C-alpha cells in the first residue's frame, strides 16, 4: 500500500473487506438527518418542458430508510452510494452531500473517451481520447469508434450509469462532463472526465470492457487513489477504517481528512492535457490564471479578442486583482483595434457572485443589475427570520449580508431599499405565487452594502465605475460555453443575454437539435450545511438572549412567544455540524460523521427572470444561439474552438455560420 495507488487486484482483495463491508448500524439516523436538511431545498415541481426527470427527495429518503430496516442494504458504502445517487437525481449542482465512506478512496482509470464529429456537421461518435489525437494527425483508417461498454450500447451506458449522477440540469451538459475538459487544469480539477473517474465511485466491476465498431475489444482496469488528506494508510480491517472515517471521537492526533496535501502518488497513466499547457500564451492574465486575454491568429479575425474566465471561485484580495485584470483586458482589447469579444466561460462552475456582477457592469456600465430570488416559506425559516429580524435593526442590519434573513437587509429586485417593513413582508408567503409556498421576491443582496474597493461591483457602494462607457456593443459580444456553466456563470450569462448578447456552445449528445449554453444550476444562492448550522446556532443564541432579556422579563406575552419560537427551532432544526471543516469532534450532535471536506450544500434561494416570475429559472429551457459539434482539431487544440465560434457568430453565413448544428438566430 506504500504507493497509495492501488491496482485492481489489490482493490478487490482489500476494499471488498474494508469499504464494502463497513459496519452499518447508524445509517438510518443519517437518512433522517438528510431529510431534515432536504427541507431547505428551494425548488418545487418542474414544468413539463424541463428536460431532466424530477425526483421526490423526501420520498426517496423514506424508501432508503425502509431498505435499511428490512436489510436490503448491507454496507455503509452501499448506503452512501444509494443516498448520493438519490441526491444527484435532483440535477441541482447546489444540492450536494459528502458521505464518509465515499471520501476514503477515489476510483478512476486511464482510458478517457471523447465525442468527436469528423467533419463538424456529421453526428459525433465516441472514441478513445488518444485515438481522437491520432485522428487529428490524419491516420483515420486506424481508428474505430466505441460502440459498447460492458455489453451495453456505449452512449446508453454512459448516460444511464454515470451522467445521471453529475448534477447538471441539462442532459447535454451532463454528457459533456463525461469527457476531458481542457479548462480543468486552470482550477486544479480532474481533467479526464466523469467516465474516467466515475465521480470517484467504485464502478461495480474490476474490468470494464470496451468494444469497437471493428470488433476489437479493450479491457479497462480501474485503480484506487488514497488521498493524502486521509493520513497514513495503516488500517487493517473495515472496523478500524470505519471508526476513523465515519465515527466522531477518534483518538488520533489528527481527525480523518485533516492531513495536509492532495493525492499521494501519481496515476499510472497520462491524463489528457489541460489548462495552460494546452492553450496559447495569453496577452494578459491574473496571478491565479483564472482570467486570460487572447488575440486570434487567423488573419480574418484580427478584430476579435477572447476573454477566458474559467472560474469565479475567488475572494478577498484576489477579487480586486480579478476585477483589475478584467478591466485591463477590456481596455487593452479596445485600444488595440478589437471590436468584437468572445467571452469563453467553458467549464466555469461558478463561485463568488460579486465578481460576476462586476464583470457584467464592466461590459455594460450603463445598465443596472436586476436580480430576483425567493426562498421556500417553511416553518423553520420563519423561526430563523423572526429571530434575526428582531435582533438586527438599523445600522446593525447593514453589517449582516448573510444570512439574508433579516428583513431590514432585503432590497427589491431593482435594489430599492426599505421595501420590507417587517419579516412578514419578506417571508410571505406570496399570495400570487401558484403551487408552492414561496417568499416575496427580493434581490440577491444590497449591492450598495456588498460592493467595496476590495471586492467591487463596478459603480456600486464604495467601488467607482471601472469602465465608464461600453467598449463592445451586444451584437459584438458572444459567450462561448460547453454547457458546463453553472451558478455565478449562469447568472452572468443570463444578464448578458438580457442585453442581446448571443451564445455558442460546443459538444453535447449526438443529436441534431438545440443545446443550452447554461446547463448547470441556475439557483439564486447556495448554502452549505455548515452555513445552515451556523445560522441555526446563531438563531438559538439570539432567541435565548431575547428570552432572558429585560424586555421579555417585563412582558410575559413576549416571553411566552420567544419561548415558543425557541422550542419550535429545537424541534425542526437538523443536528449541528462543526462550523468549519474538520472541527473538533465535540461539535457533532449525531453519531455519523459526514461532510468531511465541507462540500455539502442545498439551493437556498431560487432565481427568476423578468419574463417568468413564477417559474424558477432552473426549470426554464434556453437554447444557445448556435451549437457546434467538436472536431478532432477542437479536441486536440481547444483554442481552435474560438476560430469556429468567431466565424459563426461574427462572420455571417458566408464565413461559416452554416456550421451551427442548429441555427437559431445567428
UniProtKB/Swiss-Prot annotation:
Q: Which residues form a coiled coil?
A: none
Q: Does the keyword Signal apply?
A: yes
- List the Gene3D superfamilies: 2-enoyl-CoA Hydratase, Chain A, domain 1
**Signal sequence annotation:** 1-27
Q: Does the keyword Hydrolase apply?
A: yes
Q: In which pathway does it act?
A: Mycotoxin biosynthesis
Top-level EC class: hydrolase
Residues with glycosylation annotation: 70, 214, 234, 555, 612
State the name under which the record lists this protein: Peptidase S41 family protein phomP1
Amino acid at each position: 500500500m506504500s504507493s497509495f495507488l492501488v491496482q485492481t487486484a489489490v482493490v478487490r482483495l482489500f476494499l471488498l473487506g474494508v469499504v464494502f463491508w463497513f459496519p452499518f448500524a447508524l445509517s438510518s439516523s443519517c437518512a433522517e438527518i438528510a431529510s431534515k436538511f432536504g427541507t431547505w431545498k428551494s425548488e418545487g415541481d418542474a414544468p413539463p418542458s424541463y428536460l431532466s426527470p424530477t425526483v421526490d427527495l423526501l420520498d426517496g429518503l423514506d424508501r432508503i430508510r425502509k431498505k435499511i430496516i428490512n436489510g436490503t442494504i448491507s454496507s455503509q458504502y452501499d448506503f452512501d452510494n444509494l443516498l448520493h445517487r438519490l441526491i444527484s437525481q435532483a440535477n441541482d449542482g447546489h444540492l450536494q452531500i459528502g458521505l464518509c465512506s465515499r471520501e476514503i478512496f477515489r476510483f478512476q482509470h486511464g482510458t478517457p473517451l471523447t465525442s468527436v464529429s469528423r467533419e463538424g456537421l456529421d453526428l459525433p461518435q465516441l472514441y478513445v481520447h488518444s485515438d481522437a489525437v491520432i485522428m487529428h494527425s490524419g491516420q483515420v483508417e486506424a481508428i474505430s469508434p466505441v460502440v459498447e461498454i460492458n455489453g451495453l450500447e456505449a452512449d446508453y451506458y454512459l448516460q444511464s450509469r454515470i451522467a445521471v449522477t453529475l448534477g447538471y440540469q441539462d442532459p447535454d451538459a451532463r454528457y459533456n462532463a463525461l469527457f476531458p475538459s481542457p479548462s480543468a487544469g486552470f482550477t486544479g480539477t480532474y481533467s479526464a472526465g466523469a467516465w474516467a473517474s466515475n465521480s470517484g465511485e467504485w464502478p461495480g466491476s474490476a474490468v470494464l470492457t470496451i468494444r469497437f465498431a471493428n470488433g476489437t475489444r479493450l479491457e479497462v482496469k480501474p485503480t484506487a487513489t488514497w488521498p493524502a488528506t486521509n493520513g497514513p494508510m495503516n488500517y487493517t480491517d473495515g472496523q478500524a477504517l470505519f471508526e476513523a472515517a465515519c465515527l466522531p471521537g477518534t483518538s488520533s492526533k489528527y481527525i480523518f481528512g485533516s492531513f495536509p496535501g492532495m493525492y499521494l502518488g501519481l496515476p499510472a497513466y497520462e491524463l489528457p492535457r489541460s489548462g495552460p499547457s494546452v492553450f496559447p500564451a495569453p496577452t494578459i492574465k491574473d496571478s491565479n490564471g483564472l482570467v486570460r486575454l487572447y488575440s486570434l491568429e487567423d488573419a480574418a479575425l484580427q478584430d476579435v479578442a477572447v476573454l477566458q474566465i474559467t472560474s469565479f471561485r475567488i475572494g478577498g484580495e484576489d477579487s480586486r486583482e480579478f476585477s483589475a485584470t478584467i478591466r485591463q483586458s477590456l481596455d487593452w482589447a479596445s485600444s488595440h483595434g478589437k471590436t468584437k469579444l468572445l467571452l469563453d466561460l467553458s467549464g466555469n462552475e461558478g463561485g463568488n457572485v460579486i465578481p460576476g456582477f462586476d464583470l457584467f457592469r464592466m461590459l455594460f456600465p450603463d445598465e443596472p443589475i436586476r436580480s430576483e430570488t425567493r426562498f421556500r416559506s417553511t416553518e423553520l425559516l420563519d423561526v430563523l427570520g423572526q429571530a434575526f429580524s428582531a435582533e438586527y435593526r438599523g445600522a446593525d442590519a447593514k453589517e449582516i449580508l448573510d444570512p439574508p434573513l433579516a428583513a431590514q437587509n432585503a432590497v427589491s429586485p431593482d435594489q430599492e431599499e426599505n421595501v420590507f417593513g417587517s419579516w412578514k413582508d419578506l417571508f410571505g408567503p406570496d399570495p400570487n405565487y401558484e403551487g408552492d409556498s414561496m417568499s416575496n421576491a427580493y434581490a440577491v443582496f444590497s449591492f450598495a452594502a456588498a460592493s467595496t474597493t476590495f471586492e467591487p461591483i463596478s459603480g456600486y457602494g464604495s467601488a467607482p465605475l471601472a469602465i465608464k462607457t461600453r467598449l463592445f456593443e451586444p451584437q459584438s459580444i458572444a459567450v462561448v460555453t460547453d454547457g458546463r456553466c453553472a451558478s455565478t456563470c449562469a447568472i452572468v450569462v443570463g444578464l448578458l443575454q438580457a442585453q442581446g448578447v448571443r451564445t455558442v456552445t460546443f459538444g453535447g449528445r449526438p443529436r441534431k437539435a438545440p443545446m443550452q449554453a447554461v446547463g448547470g444550476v441556475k439557483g439564486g444562492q447556495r448554502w452549505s450545511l455548515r452555513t445552515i448550522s451556523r445560522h441555526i446556532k446563531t438563531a438559538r443564541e439570539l432567541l435565548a438572549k431575547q428570552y432572558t432579556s429585560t424586555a421579555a422579563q417585563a412582558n410575559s406575552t413576549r416571553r411566552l412567544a420567544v419561548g415558543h419560537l425557541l422550542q419550535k427551532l429545537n424541534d425542526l432544526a437538523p443536528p449541528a455540524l462543526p462550523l468549519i471543516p474538520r472541527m473538533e469532534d465535540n461539535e457533532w450532535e449525531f453519531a455519523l460523521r459526514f461532510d468531511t471536506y465541507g462540500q455539502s450544500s442545498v439551493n437556498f434561494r431560487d432565481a427568476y427572470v423578468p419574463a417568468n416570475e413564477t417559474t424558477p429559472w432552473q426549470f426554464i429551457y434556453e437554447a444557445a444561439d448556435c451549437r457546434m459539434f467538436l472536431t478532432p482539431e477542437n479536441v486536440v487544440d481547444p483554442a481552435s474552438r474560438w476560430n469556429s465560434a468567431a466565424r459563426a457568430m461574427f462572420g455571417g453565413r458566408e464565413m461559416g455560420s452554416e456550421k451551427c448544428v442548429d441555427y437559431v438566430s445567428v
